[in-house]
Amino acid sequence: MFQQLSASIRHNAHIIFLCISWYFISSLASQVTKQVLTVCPLPLFLGEFQFIYTAVLAWFTCYIAYSFPGFYRIFPNGTFPEYYIDDRETSRAARKESKLSSLIIPPSKPILQTVLPLGLFQFVGKYFGHTATSLVPVSTVASIKTLSPMFILLLQKILKISTLKITLTLIFSLCTLVLGVWIIVQEDNRSPASSNELREFSKYGVICAMISMFIFVLQNIYGKTVFTYRSQTDESQSNSGFSRQESPLPLYEKLDEKLVAKKKPKSYDKLTLMIYISLVGFCLSFGWFITLEFPVLFRYFFQINSSSTVIKAFPVSLFLLNGTFHFIQAMITFHLLGEVSTLTYSIANLMKRFAIIAVSWVFIGRRITWLQVFGLVLNTLGLFLYERCTSQSKIKAKIRPE
């Protein structure tokens, strides 16, 4: 048993290393975001900076992948545009000159139709998420985000999308999840300050965190098909019957290939989507930034009525660090999505939330209470049971005859 465990760890060592790096960088990024918004509480400006900085880093990464095949082959298919005819078994890569001669796929109407909703979700979600982070502890924001399964189920029921069957286990998991989040939020917001203004700000921060979580739930439902990449090679293998199945269990259905091809949305590589989504998000939030926060920045830099400004400092290094962490998180996410199953990624993503909560408690420096630990345990149990329900539902769907 121990030999099998050690062999499994050695085989998946790079995945374990990626997950640990993901948790570490995500936790640091959350703390850096909190520090930035504490001294410079401008959520729109931070979002604008993240959008443009992410687009620049993504373009630069595409340039490296375009110029160096070895770097291109490190990442799973669908991370970059198809620069090369990639044969991973023989370690040979040839430039696809006739297919794509530019760094990213040129803008077109289908691309804009795809990224416009995602850019809008990013803009609104970032604004409320950053606002919440500036008002309440990071652990509060992270714990509220773990409520997303409940809202996903609710939206799927409202939109009449195929969803999980309501069972006692599912109900118990959601109740446990809500109770755990409630305990964490209550404990986090026990502030020594007693002013009504701070309490109102705390309540507003919780509301903003809820809105941000709801927006990103909508984004995940919409983006599920957009970020599912299939290259032409994969499609031809699938049509010829040689594609690798997710499960050894047979699928008892036969679909009209022409109908499937007609209904299936066009898929783009993840870096192209990242660049266009960032640019669209930047453009959508630019007007709001100019109206609401640019006057504040203008007064701060030109020392106009500086005594009343909300900006305590302008930490350029923290802005750059925050944007870099934000981009690295996205690249690790893309790599994991191409290396592990959807269920494994979901569990890893949930574990990331717990890491962010735990690290935020350490950074705050306050004594961790037993109620906080109990709330985190309830949160973990609820999410674990929810994932079990999800995986069992998928297995039953695969073996059910049509």
Curated annotation (Swiss-Prot):
Main location class: membrane
Presence of the UniProt keyword Oxidoreductase in the record: no
Pfam families, A to Z: TPT
Cytoplasmic side: 1-12, 72-103, 156-165, 228-271, 375-402
Transmembrane portions of the chain: 13-33, 51-71, 104-124, 135-155, 166-186, 207-227, 272-292, 354-374
BP-aspect Gene Ontology terms: phosphoenolpyruvate transmembrane import into Golgi lumen
Entry-linked InterPro entries: Sugar_P_trans_dom (IPR004853), TPT_transporter (IPR050186)
Extracellular side: 34-50, 125-134, 187-206, 293-353
Similarity remark: Belongs to the TPT transporter family.
Protein name: Uncharacterized transporter YJL193W
Source species of the chain: Saccharomyces cerevisiae (strain ATCC 204508 / S288c)
